[in-house]
């Protein structure tokens, strides 16, 4: 599911799905241009943080009662997790996979389709702009200035390049609202692990 500016009380939705018997639940914040009426705004952040806290506490309670469920944004592996490369560079857009349009054009991912500066090639000619692939290959938590001091950088891998581009005009930028929410989700995930380890 997706929550927006118009339904910030998403913890109720998640818990309702759990009450219906779903064990694997994903409800994510919408990412939209700030001109959209449903876009998450900076002033929504405090309520979203409270919702994450409410959800985390209820998940701990339910797990202890034998009625636990997974909320994907709180899943964290503190002992293993992705390989170092994935922790540094994220999803692999533009390097490990491409979006192929119905007319055969290559873009780093589906969110770049139509952004002509990121047209990498096509099915007839292959990759015609390897410099784009190189640009994405160099995009990681060490090249993103806003990631350098962030405690969550190895859990989000620098965030989404498309969101960075659409909000900052640069794939090495960041989507600050997304960063704030990611830090809170990591905090809640660690809190859940700690609370359940104490029993």
Language-model-derived ranges and their functions:
Residues 113-199:
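Flexible mid-to-C-terminal extensions adjoining Fe-S/redox cofactors in radical SAM and related proteins
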Residues 101:
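Short, acidic, Ser/Thr-enriched surface-loop or helix-capping motifs
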Residues 1-97, 114-119:
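Radical SAM enzyme [4Fe-4S]-AdoMet core and its adjacent flexible, acidic
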């Amino acid at each position: 599911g997706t929550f927006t500016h118009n339904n910030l009380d998403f913890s109720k939705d998640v818990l309702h799905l759990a009450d219906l018997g779903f064990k694997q639940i994903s409800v994510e914040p919408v990412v939209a241009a700030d001109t959209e009426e449903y876009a998450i705004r900076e002033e929504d952040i405090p309520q979203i943080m409270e919702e994450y806290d409410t959800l985390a506490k209820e998940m701990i309670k339910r797990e202890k009662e034998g009625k636990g469920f997974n909320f994907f944004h709180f899943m964290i592996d503190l002992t293993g997790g992705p390989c170092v490369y994935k922790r540094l560079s994220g999803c692999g857009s533009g390097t490990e996979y491409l979006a192929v349009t119905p007319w055969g054009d290559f873009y780093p991912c589906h969110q770049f389709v139509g952004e002509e500066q990121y047209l990498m090639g096509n099915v007839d000619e292959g990759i015609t702009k390897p410099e784009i692939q190189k640009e994405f290959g160099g995009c990681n938590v060490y090249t993103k200035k806003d990631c350098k001091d962030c405690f969550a950088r190895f859990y989000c891998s620098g965030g989404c390049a498309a969101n960075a581009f659409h909000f900052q005009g640069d794939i090495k930028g960041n989507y600050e609202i997304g960063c704030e929410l990611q830090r809170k989700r990591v905090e809640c995930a660690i809190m859940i692990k700690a609370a359940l380890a104490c029993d």
